[in-house]
From Swiss-Prot:
ABC transporter domain span: 37-278
UniProt-recorded name of the protein: Phosphate import ATP-binding protein PstB
SMART domains: AAA
Species, as recorded: Staphylococcus aureus (strain bovine RF122 / ET3-1)
Binding site for ATP: 69-76
Role played: Part of the ABC transporter complex PstSACB involved in phosphate import. Responsible for energy coupling to the transport system.
GO cellular component: plasma membrane
Location within or outside the cell: Cell membrane
Keyword check for Phosphoprotein: no
Gene Ontology biological-process annotations: phosphate ion transmembrane transport
Gene behind this protein: pstB
Length: 283
C-alpha cells in the first residue's frame, strides 16, 4: 500500500541539506537530524498589517518543534505558510523564502497540491467530515487515485493504528464521525492526515478544545509519531511545550524572539522576554 500511494507523489525525496552551511537560527544539538524546512528572511503582510517580520528558522526532521507566544504574535500564520494555506486569505503577500527539502515552496512551478500531500495539518477544533469514520480516512487516498477496496481497508487500519485509536473504532468504522467524542474526533483527524503518508504534520493547538484525558492521549500519540514524522505544533500551553517538544521557537510581535532546544528555553532562556513569557509575566 505504501508504495502504491507513494507512486502518486511527485516531489522528490532525494534532496538533502548541508546543515553546516545554514546561516539561520538553529538549536545546538542538531547533528543527528537533517533540516527539512528552512525559512529565510520571511516577511508576510495581511494587507498593511506586517504579521511576520524577518523570520529565519530551520526545522529539523523527526523532531517536535513547538511554536509558542502570546495571541496575535504570528504563530498560526507562520505554520500556515509552511503549506501555503495562508494564501487562502486574499490580502496576503509574502517576501523571502521557505525551502522544503531544498525547494522554494513559493516558486511558481512548485505545486501547492503536492506540498499539501507531504505536509498535513491538524486544526485546533476537531474537524471530521460529515461522513463515516471509514470515509474520513479514505478521502485523501481516493483523491490520489486509490480505489482498490483491499488497499483502502489496509490504509484505514494502518492510519487508525497510527493514531492509536484502531482498537476503539475497529467495530464502528461505518459510524458517522460526528458521533465520536471530541478526543476521538481529533485522533480520527490525525489518522486522516496519516492516510496520505505525509512527511510533516502541522498542528495548530491540537488539544486546546479537549479535556485533560484526551489531551494526554494526543500528547502521547505525538511523541510516538515523531519516529516517522516531523511535527510542528503551535501551543499556548507552556507545560505541553515543555513536555512534548524537542525544540521551541518563541514568537513575539511577528518576530522569532528565541529558538533553541526546549530544555534550554525552559531552564535557561537567553532572552529576558522569553523568560518573562514562559514564567507567566505576560501573555
Amino acid at each position: 500500500m505504501a508504495q502504491t500511494l507513494a507512486q502518486t507523489k511527485q516531489i522528490s525525496q532525494s534532496h538533502t541539506f548541508d546543515v553546516s552551511q545554514s546561516h539561520h537560527k538553529t538549536p545546538n544539538d542538531t547533528n543527528s537530524h537533517s533540516v527539512i524546512y528552512s525559512t529565510q528572511n520571511l516577511d508576510l503582510w495581511y494587507g498593511e498589517n506586517h504579521a511576520l517580520q524577518n523570520i529565519n528558522l530551520d526545522i529539523y526532521e523527526n523532531q517536535i518543534t513547538a511554536i509558542i507566544g502570546p495571541s496575535g504574535c504570528g504563530k498560526s500564520t507562520y505554520i500556515k505558510t509552511l503549506n501555503r494555506m495562508v494564501e487562502l486569505v486574499p490580502t496576503v503577500k509574502t517576501a523571502g523564502k521557505i525551502l522544503y527539502r531544498d525547494q522554494d515552496i513559493f516558486d511558481q512551478k512548485y505545486s501547492k497540491e503536492q506540498l499539501r500531500t507531504n505536509v498535513g495539518m491538524v486544526f485546533q477544533q476537531p474537524n471530521p467530515f460529515p461522513k463515516s469514520i471509514y470515509d474520513n480516512i479514505t478521502y485523501g487516498p481516493k483523491i490520489h487515485g486509490i480505489k482498490n477496496k483491499k488497499v483502502l481497508d489496509e490504509i484505514v487500519e494502518k492510519s487508525l493504528r497510527g493514531a492509536a485509536i484502531w482498537d476503539e473504532l475497529k467495530d464502528r468504522l461505518h459510524t458517522n464521525a460526528y458521533s465520536l467524542s471530541g478526543g476521538q474526533q481529533q485522533r480520527v483527524c490525525i489518522a486522516r492526515c496519516l492516510a496520505i503518508e505525509p512527511e510533516v504534520i502541522l498542528m495548530d493547538e491540537p488539544t486546546s478544545a479537549l479535556d485533560p484525558i484526551s489531551t494526554l492521549r494526543v500528547e502521547e500519540l505525538v511523541q510516538e509519531l515523531k519516529e516517522k514524522y516531523t511535527i510542528i505544533m503551535v501551543t499556548h500551553n507552556m507545560q505541553q511545550a515543555a513536555r512534548v517538544s524537542d525544540k521551541t521557537a518563541f514568537f513575539l510581535n511577528g518576530y522569532v524572539n528565541e529558538y533553541d532546544d526546549t530544555d534550554k528555553i525552559f531552564s535557561n532562556p537567553s532572552n529576558k522576554k522569553t523568560e518573562d513569557y514562559i514564567s507567566g509575566r505576560f501573555g
